[in-house]
Swiss-Prot record:
Gene this protein is translated from: prcB
Means of activity regulation: The formation of the proteasomal ATPase ARC-20S proteasome complex, likely via the docking of the C-termini of ARC into the intersubunit pockets in the alpha-rings, may trigger opening of the gate for substrate entry. Interconversion between the open-gate and close-gate conformations leads to a dynamic regulation of the 20S proteasome proteolysis activity.
Entry annotated with the keyword DNA repair: no
Xref: InterPro entries: Ntn_hydrolases_N (IPR029055), Pept_T1A_subB (IPR000243), Proteasome_sua/b (IPR001353), Proteasome_suB-type (IPR023333), PSB_actinobac (IPR022483)
Record's GO cellular component terms: cytoplasm; proteasome core complex, beta-subunit complex
Pfam short name (any one): Proteasome
Enzyme class label: hydrolase
Catalytic activity: Cleavage of peptide bonds with very broad specificity
GO biological process: modification-dependent protein catabolic process; proteasomal protein catabolic process
Name of the protein in question: Proteasome subunit beta
Family indicated by similarity: Belongs to the peptidase T1B family.
Species assigned in the record: Frankia alni (strain DSM 45986 / CECT 9034 / ACN14a)
PANTHER family recorded: ATP-DEPENDENT PROTEASE SUBUNIT HSLV, METALLOPROTEASE TLDD
Alphabetized GO MF terms: threonine-type endopeptidase activity
Record bears the keyword Protease: yes
Amino acid sequence: MADPMGGAGRLPAVFMTPGTSSFTDFLSQSAPHLLPGARGGLPGPVTEVAHGTTIVAVTFPGGVIMAGDRRATQGHMIAQRDVEKVHHADDFSCVGYAGTAGVGAELIRLFQVELEHYEKIEGATLSLDAKANRLAAMVKGNLPMALQGLAVVPLFAGYDPDLDKGRIFSYDIAAAKSEERTYESIGSGSVFAKGSLKKRFRVDLTQDDAVRIAVEALYDAADDDSATGGPDTIRKLYPIVASVTSDGYRRYGDDEVEPVVTAIIADRSTSAGG
């Protein structure tokens, strides 16, 4: 019987064969069963799984802010109160997800490895457009699972050094990619979040202003959508907030987000209409 390891102390031949710089393509050739979309053939639609809810992204001159609530739901139940749905993609981009929590987390981990693998193989980073296209291909690969109820859609944002600005890309479950010029929201509370952003967005926002209206949009979404979690001041659970600028990716600490939440609550206390 042939040794699958190619002999004692040797890597399998697949690791030694020159090929693509895409980790996803490599995985599809060497271990396709590990890809998120390769586990189709379920007996029927799946419903009793945790779902992540609302993500928002807002551009400002020189960068972009992304923020996400912390709630995951399972039917009418709160499955988790401290989910992290906004993540570092690479040094100059971030990604969030809405939909099936397990599939979303797996998709993001694979995307992070995809970008890191390309950089190590090629010695250069992908352009922001190329990163967005790679993510679209991965979303398309999950389509069989999405059609059986395990849908997930990402929101991707980053800093484009060629244009010196932040950019936002959204997707549907069939991997159609759209660039959003100013702001975007995905998830169950997105219609309320976008309504909030529409009222408050300005082209001359400062970075602090962008953080404020992103958190406020999540607050508005939570006010009308039961699947979106608002700031939990008792448990000290606040939205995940990240920025991407020419200085790179930065996640805001809870000690930075808490004063923003406190100011919003104080303002709402004196202006009940929001």
